[in-house]
Amino acid sequence: MRLPSVSVVLPTRSRLGLLPEAVRSVCAQTLPPTELLIIDDGSQGEVHSAIRPVIDHAHFPITVRPGPGRGPGPARNVGVTAARGDLIAFVDDDDLWQPEKLAWQTSWFAADASLGLVGTEAERTAVPRQAKLSGLPPRRLRRVPRSALVRANPLVTSSVVARRECFDICGGFDESLRLAQDWEMWLRIARHWQVAVVPAPLTIYRVHAEQRSRDRVEMRGCEAEVLRRGLARGSISGDRLRALARRRIAWAHCRQGRALLRAGRTGQAEKELREAISLFRLQPLAWTGLVRCRLTRFAVSRGDAA
């Protein structure tokens, strides 16, 4: 059984202290990739110098290419376009892989042509360590139904390996989205292929001070937009999935409205909560949030009158 070749795409931006460890974890794979493509998306510093000691001992080509400077999604697209492998694996510059990761995932792709994307479980930690794994991959993958992908993004991007064909047919990451580009991509892939997860912590998601905190309001807005695009593009199809997506959009508006309310942005909060109720009326949290908006406005008006 011929194993498919793997190209690794690693976007990076000004994390020269963390990048060498990520590259080293790729080089330590028991099944080495065909190539590693590092997309420098505007680092303040010399990427080549930071990883030179690792490159000198690698047994496969490591290439640094310039990125467009517009975030990880566009940078990943540069890597996908340049990749030569049958499979494309993604890893972020602040995450790590266990040595068995690519070997286990690649063996599943070779055995099952219906698979388009295979992720792994991820260990979230501030202190990376090498997990004690059995010598053989699990006997079964955990399939990810499309309904689970509509509810939320269950995949850490650094855990994902996908067939090259997925991008040839579905296109690349949607660069017009500010956030959640990966989730929108997985939804498109899941329309045509099976999605699964190796039930073992083969990816290490590092928690560290440099991680950029996201505005919760912006995150909720992007969640709703991803699902809207899925409905419009047909990546979310069928009556049950479409109904589920509409409920999830309503729930995203509800959470966004409540986050705005906590931030004191009452007018915007009321707009979001009304939108949530218009999409799905049976949302007690949206109704109670709307009542709080009105009470807040009433209290402010009474205070102004006094």
Task: For the regions a language model picked out, list residue spans one by one.
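C-terminal subregions of glycosyltransferases and related glycan-biosynthesis enzymes
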Residues: 3, 207-306
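Nucleotide-sugar donor-binding/catalytic module of glycosyltransferases
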Residues: 1-221
